[in-house]
Amino acid sequence: MASGSGSSSSTSSSALSGRLPGSRSANPRKARILGLFDAIQDAVGPPKQAAADRRTVEKTWKLMDKVVRLCQNPKLQLKNSPPYILDILPDTYQHLRLILSKYDDNQKLAQLSENEYFKIYIDSLIKKSKRAMRLFKEGKERMYEEQSQERRNLTKLSLIFSHMLAEIKAIFPSGQFQGDNFRITKADAAEFWRKFFGERTIVPWKIFRQCLHEVHQISSGLEAMALKSTIDLTCNDYISVFEFDIFTRLFQPWGSILRNWNFLAVTHPGYMAFLTYDEVKARLQKYSLKPGSYIFRLSCTRLGQWAIGYVTADGNILQTIPHNKPLFQALIDGSREGFYLYPDGRSYNPDLTGLCEPTPHDHIKVTQEQYELYCEMGSTFQLCKICAENDKDVKIEPCGHLMCTSCLTSWQESDGQGCPFCRCEIKGMEPIIVDPFDPRDESRCFSFSDSLCTPMLDFDDDDLREECLIMNRLAALRKMNERQNSPVTSPGSSPLSQRRKTPPEPLQIPHLNLPPVPPRLDLIQKGLARSPCASPTGSPKSSPCMVRKQDKPLPAPPPLLREPPPPPERPPPIPPDSRTCRHLHHADNVPCRDQSTPHEAWCTRDLSGGNPASVCRVTHDGSPKLGVPSSSVLNGRHSRMSTEAGFMRHKHHKRRESPLETLRVYNGLSGNEEYDVPPRLSPPTITIHPIVKCPVLVNSVSDKVRNSAEEDDCEYKIPSSHPVSSRLPLHCHSIKHFPRLCENGQCLSNGTHNGISEIKKLKPPDQGDVIATSTVPIHFPPARTSARENHPHGSSLTRTPSDYDLLVPHPGEESFDISPPSQPPPPPPARTCVTEHVMPTALGSRPNSDVDLFLPHSDPCPEAPLPPARRGPGEVKSNRLSQEYDQLPSCPGKGQEKASNTKGELLLPNQNLIMRPT
């Protein structure tokens, strides 16, 4: 026990001496004696600590109070500059009271008193208080002399008390013990601590030295003693996780930490241990006539950072804290600029360029989910969210937030405290490289691998029997494996490299997962109101262009296995209650269902909607072109090829639907649709006349809204949802056309798919509804208002819209009373006409709507269909929202908006965490 106490006092005295033990000015004989004491202590081990109960803590308070009263003597004339012992000890007292208040009951207090770190801390605090009292007792009048050795020892004790206060606040934040959750700044150093010490908060120096020696070899006992005096900031023969974190930040990087420490702390003449701000100014005062003289020390107010004092050209003495770079890099840069030339006034300035090694940048891989999320906000993951101009290239430690170097430098130069996002203390910075998400490579491989590996396969048996599809998937899997094993890609140990690999070890998880970026509610709300791919600003310049998806050939389209029957000449009359809406078509625009589309006409399709930059359409000549997304009807089947979800049916559930667009149907299928091939039913048919002026009716139930950035300024066709009849004559009207999408000759109209959809009703042109007109001008007399437009709407039909409903009635129609097909009537005369008919009187539950909208004409026309029914107010609003969806203005300047929001966040007043005694 005596030997342990003697060793402790010897170590404390060596730490409080002017230079490091083992340095140039140390006495070799004294070093050998200290080495002998250190060997004895290693053999015996540190003494066991008594339980830190309430009585022991109160005893510590009394000792601290005595030290404060001794330091309040006016003869001392202590300067109120860090470290100011008259502030440090009262703050320590207040924090200990806070800790005891959190452990007030007996059970918690017993747990606190047995806490390993707390016992060692209280014991060390008692020893340091007794040592300060002994200084006053032994120094007597010399304590009042500012240049005496006793006064110098008191200043060093003040530094130790300052380190102990910072440590207890870090281990017991808010009075609660968090030592087992303390985050070490450097990832490699944190891995070392967890590997050897687990969740321990503090370990004896002997154990720490042995474990460190396994990773970084310690050459001699003198080097071990010097290393201990540098790491052990509280001088208690223990190394805490807090002290280890400070040491690794000071002498980074971890891979060469002992070499850096030897160059900077042992052999460098400019290093000063346990020196204060005032002492640096006093030491450099004698070199005021030698500009370029400098010394450096540990910052006592910002532990883990360096403070460099130097003499300027005009003889002033300044002190600075270098940011965003290691100390040796700051000294090299300062030497080149002429600031740091003479360490401690000496002419020899060590060359530190040997410490400069190319530090490998951590690669942060942008995942598909992050890519889609930031695209919805009109941004990219790699873009700095403060300036919205530069890419992120630096990571703040330990919180892990990313930004660009210029924003971080500006923030620190403006006296910003902590991280600009979370206000967490900035303990270090690491350069990083953000690898953007490339839809060409990653998503396609992942989609094929997921489609083969996931147990929830939902492919058609016909598709699985095709060799070409299976071979393409296997080739994509091999390519993905080669890319993951390639040295070009970022290493698996880099942060946020969330690849689809085996889960990382639990020890690496805190450093692999970066915290989320603070949400931008304004951008998220805008992103919900529109699709990222439909907006012209959905893909910024810094994001990978979606057009590149077409560079690589897609797998061959599935062959025609279930071909629907050929269409007859004319559509048979079907009761209107079981009929869906019809559109007008031209033969040169409609691709034949029996015609196979060439391989080049296949185009990728985004999961979240059509992207004008990533989809193609088949024009009148049949050639694929970029532009408005088409329905991609191939062989009577809808194209499901996607670069982001292969042939995976279950991926449809992951799409994000806008709250303003509740009418949207993805790929022509509702959310609960489970089939992929239309049922074999006898569909209504059409007769296509490319030259005839009178367009005929085509059955189409693509009543969904398609997103697009282009609008065709041409005349469109008038949809009709009723069969022809000979009861009313033909009328010709003149209506105003509205620009709207027309894909592959098919006019798109709005519809609902909430399980039960109301029959499409007519809406006046002035309400912004989608009106498709023929390419031939149609003239009508003015329509008069109908008294039946205020009638309640008719019964709705249960139907599920789908792209496969083209020329195919809904499967549910067979369960109702459908009239058998009649003989097709003779073709109508070759002239432009729009027909209508009267509703059957048998359907009393369905009121007639707007039959009087088209006036009788003298020219009779057999079999005229009813016009579409007028929409109700609720449907008018839905369609208006859907139409405005394609015409959303571009997002306002993201840079200004984000900068303003961030600025408003950054200007929060800093809280003063220092508690003063009352």
Swiss-Prot record:
Q: Where is this region: Linker?
A: 355-383
Query: Zinc finger (RING-type) residue ranges?
Result: 384-423
- Give the matching CDD domains: RING-HC_Cbl, SH2_Cbl-b_TKB
Q: Provide the binding site for 4-O-phospho-L-tyrosine.
A: 297
One annotated GO molecular function is: zinc ion binding
Per the record, the domain comment is: The N-terminus is composed of the phosphotyrosine binding (PTB) domain, a short linker region and the RING-type zinc finger. The PTB domain, which is also called TKB (tyrosine kinase binding) domain, is composed of three different subdomains: a four-helix bundle (4H), a calcium-binding EF hand and a divergent SH2 domain.
Described by its record, this protein's role is as follows:
E3 ubiquitin-protein ligase which accepts ubiquitin from specific E2 ubiquitin-conjugating enzymes, and transfers it to substrates, generally promoting their degradation by the proteasome.
- Indicate what this protein is called per its UniProt record: E3 ubiquitin-protein ligase CBL-B-A
Its source organism is Xenopus laevis (African clawed frog)
Record lineage: Eukaryota, Metazoa, Chordata, Craniata, Vertebrata
